[in-house]
């Protein structure tokens, strides 16, 4: 999309003294459809509306020094009073604010219904995503249970569902696998030690001095990463550095999730085929995994393959029906739970594990394991991994909470959301859990089934508690291929983003490129590197946009004080001898040369004019030998007898957000070059920040502050008045464009 179609309107305050009511209530412009510039010129004898200078008095800045500022801040934040203590407690525990006001009659039915449905959906997904995180199934149930309870206490969003999220599970799984390899564990060390660990004992590996087996060490790594990620999130909330999420644009997050979805799909392929393959990590793991899959395709377990196909044939159409008829269905069909129950019964009574060597979930213990402190020795190894995990987690949580709050007309506190998601990771990390965040799919289900408040999270937790205390062992015979299918089917939303690309391309090609770069790097390199590449590329695109910004000459809309781009609109009026130039970007060291070249190209190049004058003077010298004083006299005569048509350049600064020292120096240089050939430079519509920069940078002297105007129209009127006062003859028809 060209910037001309989005040019800003520069509307100056009309002269109230004139009482002019002749302006039309609406301004109609016709977009320029042709390559040639079509505009009208004022006649030379036209009179500009009477010129009156706009004067605005600036607010006086307080002279508070740094010491006084610090003292005031400390007094404000460090005072202890009953009222302040109460506000702090209520702010940290939002449940104490809204729960006493809970409307039981109005909200209870919707909250219970949505909580039940989300809980039913979470049971199979929690078990399935545990495999993605490299953990035993019970740990996924723990994670969803504790996250639901803690967010109920600390969260400010009424609608988001906090629990396991596929992309974070993938990132946890990659870290866990790497640490398992570093510790010397391999696929052979997968003894079912959950029952032993749950009884408080440890298992000694016969080949080493390890204090626990592979699954025990895996959750140790996962809980340590989760603890550090939670600490990062709480620290970001405490220091109010949520601005980090600003660098994660919607295009970047969408591309990252889509790229990670390919990695998730790839990691689940071995379960669908029943292959016993090592999990690959690092750069290019997606390609390496598929190479391993095709090399071992002849070892496919037909029982697992048939089960996977049958589950896909049931899950995909039903999920599509749920989505297509969600407005007519009171609640989505819990097809995942139906498939899990049916597959578990078929596997148990058909003895698929014993007869066909089908891989199953295995023993899932009931109850809760004793809390355990994260492994401090692992912190140096996983601290860097936790940075990306924490940023993705809070960015998705905050963006979803703000989106649904806006939709339903209430507000959320971004910092409190960071506290909430941080403690949803810190506290559960002591109870054998891994990282959580909000998830869009479950949040949409929660909203569509009548959720009103955070109380629905308690109902979800009760459903999970029932499974943990009673039902969990019944999933012993559940095939892992079924869990893999559930994981893959839930990737539909992320993979459908490809359908949005044509629309995204028509809106912003730059965002589309960011999406592709982030998606490809996340899929082909790794999730962490993909996120880093996406952030760096987004920042590069921002710099690129300001390095080569759009600029244009402006014309006056007839019978108004509105100025628009002559290259975008037709029938705009151009005042002879005055060029109005708009630069759509901050003016700083990166784009200063672009500013000068665009200005010189679209108006007149003062350097070329001075060179032409010098050449003309030299020709005069060759024709007639004169003294040095004579040369100066001849040049002065030459200049006075060949006046330029262009006498004023007005720079519209409305789109210039800020200036740096290089930008101020560039404006000084431009002004000096133009004044050398008799053209005055005026600045219009400078915001207060730009005005302060110009004043501090000594762009003009105190008596020259009249060269800064509050509107483009005011600057144009001033230029005409000053030209008429000087009595300069302005010839018509002379073009000075340097094109």
UniProtKB/Swiss-Prot annotation:
Record field: transmembrane: 112-132, 137-157, 219-239, 242-262, 378-398, 420-440, 455-475, 524-544
Residues making up the signal peptide according to the UniProt record: none
Protein name: Sulfate transporter
Matching InterPro entries: S04_transporter_CS (IPR018045), SLC26A/SulP_dom (IPR011547), SLC26A/SulP_fam (IPR001902), STAS_dom (IPR002645), STAS_dom_sf (IPR036513)
PROSITE patterns the UniProt entry points to: SLC26A (PS01130), STAS (PS50801)
Organism: Homo sapiens
Region (Disordered): 1-27
NCBIfam families: sulP
Residue span(s) of domain STAS: 568-719
Effect of residue 425 to D: In ACG1B; significant loss of sulfate transport
Family: Belongs to the SLC26A/SulP transporter (TC 2.A.53) family.
Protein's membrane topology: Multi-pass membrane protein
Glycan attachment sites: 199, 205, 357
Gene: SLC26A2
């Amino acid at each position: 999309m060209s910037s001309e179609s989005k040019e800003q309107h520069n509307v100056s305050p009309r002269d109230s003294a004139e009482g002019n009511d002749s302006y039309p209530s609406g301004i109609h412009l016709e977009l320029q459809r042709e390559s040639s510039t079509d505009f009208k010129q004022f006649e030379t004898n036209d009179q500009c509306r009477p010129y009156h200078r706009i004067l605005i008095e600036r607010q006086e800045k307080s002279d508070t020094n740094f010491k006084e500022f610090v003292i005031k801040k400390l007094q404000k934040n460090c005072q202890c009073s009953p009222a302040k203590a109460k506000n702090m407690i209520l702010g940290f525990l939002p449940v104490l604010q809204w729960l006493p006001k809970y409307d039981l009659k109005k909200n209870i039915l919707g909250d219970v219904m949505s909580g039940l449905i989300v809980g039913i959906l979470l049971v199979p997904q929690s078990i399935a995503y545990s495999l993605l995180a490299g953990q035993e199934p019970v740990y996924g149930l723990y994670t969803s249970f504790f996250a639901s309870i803690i967010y109920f206490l600390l969260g400010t969003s009424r609608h988001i569902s906090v629990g396991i999220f596929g992309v974070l599970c993938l990132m946890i799984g990659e870290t866990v696998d790497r640490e398992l390899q570093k510790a010397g564990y391999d696929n052979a060390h997968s003894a079912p030690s959950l029952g032993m660990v749950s009884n408080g004992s440890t298992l000694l590996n016969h080949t080493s001095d390890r204090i626990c087996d592979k699954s025990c060490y895996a959750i140790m790594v996962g809980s340590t990463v989760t603890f550090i990620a939670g600490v990062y999130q709480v620290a970001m909330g405490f220091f109010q550095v949520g601005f980090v999420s600003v660098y994660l644009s919607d295009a970047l997050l969408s591309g990252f999730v889509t790229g990670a979805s390919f990695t998730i799909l790839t990691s689940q392929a071995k379960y669908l085929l029943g292959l016993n393959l090592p999990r690959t990590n690092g750069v290019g793991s997606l390609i390496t995994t598929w190479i391993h899959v095709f090399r071992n395709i002849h070892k496919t377990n037909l029982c697992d393959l048939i089960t996977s196909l049958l589950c896909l044939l049931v899950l995909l159409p039903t999920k599509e029906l749920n989505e297509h008829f969600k407005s007519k269905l009171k609640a989505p069909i819990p097809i995942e739970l139906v498939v899990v129950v049916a597959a578990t019964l078929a596997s148990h009574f058909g003895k698929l594990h014993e007869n066909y060597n089908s891989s199953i979930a295995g023993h899932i213990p009931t109850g809760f394991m004793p809390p355990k402190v994260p492994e401090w020795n692992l912190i140096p190894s996983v601290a860097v991994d936790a940075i990306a995990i924490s940023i993705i987690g809070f960015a998705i949580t905050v963006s979803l909470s703000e989106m649904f709050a806006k939709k339903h007309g209430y507000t959320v506190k971004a910092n409190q959301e960071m506290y909430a998601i941080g403690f949803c990771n810190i506290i559960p990390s002591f109870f054998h859990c891994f990282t959580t965040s909000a998830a869009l799919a479950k949040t949409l289900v929660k909203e569509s089934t009548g959720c009103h408040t955070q109380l629905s999270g308690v109902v979800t937790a009760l459903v999970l508690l029932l499974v943990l205390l009673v039902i969990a062992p019944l999933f012993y015979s559940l095939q892992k291929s079924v869990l893999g299918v559930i994981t893959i089917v839930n990737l539909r939303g992320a993979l459908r983003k490809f359908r949005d690309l044509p629309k995204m391309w028509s809106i912003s090609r730059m965002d589309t490129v960011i999406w592709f770069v982030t998606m490809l790097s996340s899929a082909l390199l790794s999730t962490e590197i993909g996120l880093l590449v996406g952030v760096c590329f987004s920042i590069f695109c921002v710099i690129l946009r300001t390095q080569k910004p759009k600029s244009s000459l402006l014309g006056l809309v007839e019978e108004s004080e509105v100025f628009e781009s002559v290259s975008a609109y037709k029938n705009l009026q151009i005042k002879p001898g005055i060029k109005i130039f708009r630069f759509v970007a901050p003016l700083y060291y990166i784009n200063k040369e672009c500013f000068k070249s665009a200005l010189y190209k679209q108006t007149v190049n003062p350097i070329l004019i001075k060179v032409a004058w010098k050449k003309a003077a030299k020709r005069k010298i060759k024709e007639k030998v004169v003294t040095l004083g004579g040369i100066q006299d001849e040049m002065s005569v030459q200049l006075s007898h060949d006046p330029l048509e262009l006498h004023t350049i007005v720079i519209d600064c409305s789109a210039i957000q800020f200036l740096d020292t290089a930008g101020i120096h560039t404006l000084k240089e431009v002004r000096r070059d133009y004044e050398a050939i008799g053209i005055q430079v005026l600045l219009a519509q400078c915001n207060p920040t730009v005005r302060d920069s110009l004043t501090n940078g000594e762009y003009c002297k105190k008596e020259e502050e009249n060269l800064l105007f509050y509107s483009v129209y005011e600057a144009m009127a001033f230029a005409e008045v000053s030209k008429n006062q000087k009595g300069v003859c302005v010839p018509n028809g002379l073009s000075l464009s340097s094109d």
